Amino acid sequence: MTIVADVRPDLMPYYKEDCDPKNLAPLWEVLHTFARKTPKSDCQPYIWHYNEIRDTLMKSADLITAEQAERRVLILENPGMRGRYRVTTSLFAGLQLIMPGEIAPAHRHTQAALRFIVEGSGAYTAVDGEKTYMEEGDFVITPSWTWHDHGNESDQPMVWLDGLDVPLVETLDTTFAEPYPEKNQSGTRPSGDSLARYGMGLAPVDYEPQSPNSPIFNYPYARTREALETMRKTEEWDACHGLKLRYVNPDNGKAAMPTIGTFMQLLPKGFETATYQSTDATVFSVVEGSGKSIIGDQTFEWSKRDHFVVPCWVPQRHIANEDAVLFSFSDRPVQQTLGLWRENRGNA
């Protein structure tokens, strides 16, 4: 084999012409895009102020019913990825509206979904035959390939944040979906059954977990808020997060959903977090209070029901004007399982 001492870069265009019809490409021309010192993402910081978008969301009810739309949702589309229907590189987010008396028909799909209740009270989600009635701040899961439908038996509009792993599932080419044979499911278990069975620190004596998903599908905000309020008495505040809890699967202590991590945190009045970075781009929903977040070189003022996104590895700080509670979700469980997740706690 002859070792070439003098390369001929002037011949490279002809070489690439030879590669192209054979579906080949020289790695050396793109290697720098694969091996970077730090992550690069199309995801951009952004905030959706609820008082600016609520009217637009409500107008959708004059144009299409929940049944016609199947899911009447306004996508929270990241400005850096317009037309790609995602809030981060791997996650979808949107605000879903169910008006009084409406039903969003039952279906199932391989994408896992979360519902975080933003406005209203008394609507339900049914998952595999069990209804759960939802209140503001409740966190509800519909695991991959479970039948689910929604209905509003109250006299007021119901709005919740949808979070799904749609882009991740698309990347893996594992998308399947199926409509239920009827408009909605028949109830096979009483409301609250899963919480009673698995959410009280107890489980049926012969119970053997069959799924990586939590057997609980509604985590009521009243219980979460009580936990935060009790824990704040110890005055043990994390410099980067205040007081932050994660929702867990009681079967194994891992995330409630294997592809989406979910969190709730309390920032006391006047608290300013230390600078923090992590590889999981994160979507926040403001449950209580007001404040501001410095994300990269931008400052975003937020209050109740606003939603904002922090991209991967972009420095973030949060400042609470008053006691503030923030719900958030990200793809952290996936990154941790693959050994990819990392954080930088800055000056903490």
Regions found by a protein language model. Name each.
Residues 1-11, 15, 153-212, 217, ...:
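Double-stranded beta-helix
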Residues 1-89, 185-259, 263:
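A short, N-terminal "cap"/entry segment at the start of jelly-roll beta-barrel domains
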Residues 81-92, 99-114, 129, 252-261, ...:
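A short beta-loop-beta micro-motif enriched in histidine and acidic residues
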Residues 99-136, 143-146, 151, 277-304:
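A short beta-strand-loop-beta hairpin characteristic of the jelly-roll/cupin
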Residues 148-149, 168-170, 254, 269, ...:
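Flexible loop/turn segments at secondary-structure boundaries
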Residues 267, 280-290, 299-311, 325-327, ...:
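Active/binding-pocket-proximal capping segment
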